[in-house]
Curated annotation (Swiss-Prot):
Species per Swiss-Prot/TrEMBL record: Dehalococcoides mccartyi (strain ATCC BAA-2266 / KCTC 15142 / 195)
Assigned EC number: 1.1.1.23
Record protein name field: Histidinol dehydrogenase
Binding site for Zn(2+): Q266, H269, D368, H427
Entry GO CC: cytosol
Amino acid sequence: MEIIRGFAPAEKRLSRRDKAGFFLDETQRAELAKRLGVDPEKAVNGIIDDIRKQGDKAVLEYTLKFDRAAISKLEVSPAEIKQAAGEIPAELFEALKLAATQVRAYHHFQKEAVWKAAEIMQGKQLIRPLERVGLYVPGGKAFYPSTVLMTAIPAKEAGVDEIILVTPPGADGKIPAPTLAAAYIAGVDKVFACGGAQAVAALAFGTKSIPKVDKICGPGNIFVTLAKKAVFGVVDIDGLQGPSEVLILADQYANAEYCASDILAQAEHDVLASPIMVTTSAELAKRVNDIVETKAGSCARKDIIRQSLRDNGLIAVVDNMDEAIKLANMYATEHLCLLVKDSEQYLSRINHAGCIFYGEKASVVMGDYVAGPSHALPTSGTARFSSPLNILDFVKYIDIVNVSKEEVTKLGKAAVTIARAEGLECHAEAALKRME
């Protein structure tokens, strides 16, 4: 990993974050298109257009083209979903159930807090769950049952009427049993074997098989993300997720093995993942780097890890915790790990992060699977203005206005004055009628 010293060099290096293609200028976009062999935005727009015109037929054709899966139907039957729950190892099934319990409890607690606030606003505002939500779960060569739980359960707790899940099938045309088992545990209503931009388009516009949804949530590759960006406005989306990232703040008291294990876990995600550590200890920086370099070669995904560390890994050594926290807030990371003495005292100084892990035992991996909050977090600096996926993503607020006879004269007079100042005489007349 690259080790740099000093606040200014670290700030400059961290500001060069890869935006994964959806915030790039024309030159950067051209470079990305050359690397991928296709202009991703043009490809996505073409796919969306095909889905709008041809529906299921186009979805099936793209599933064959991109996933090499020759399937004749998109929907997975309820019987297949239930059957999958009995096919996976008992230990995995119990682990998924425990994770589901944790996620459900966390979001139920949040729901109670939100509904309590709504009671205070009684007569002023209504809360209504979205009717139908589409969840995108990455798949194909790998499978992510944890993402099913982390997206479906908050939607379920919020009261969404119908939860639709899309995920790419393998080359055999099937969705992995752990993914289906997680859908069963989470209470997903329908599952469709399709992925990529074509699945996003199908959710946004609807096909004969796949119903149109009100909102699309869940992470994916650059094509999925650009498709979500393109259909925003037709439907709502949770955000534009880029490559996964962690920033570890560590002082001289930090356990070097813990720091190294979290860095390796982050690098294991994919070659675009960003494992970052900012420390006040040059000695710790060297120890952590030595451990990472030694262990990386023995990991199952060593090639991915090494490329991630080479291209995006960084250890920055700064003078004090003030500088470290300033860098953390500037970077606005997806995962922020506080491996420092008395870590709780620094929580009030963190303004921008998707999720904060403090205390030695709070590994990011716990948040990935079993801590309770959703692991669907803002990335690429969007933690400066957005939040983790939660029940508020699956409800909407409706304001209520009622004006009493006692209020209408005072309020109406002001309304008439403002309406006439804006040159809207009919507005003024409507207010005057209520004042008669």
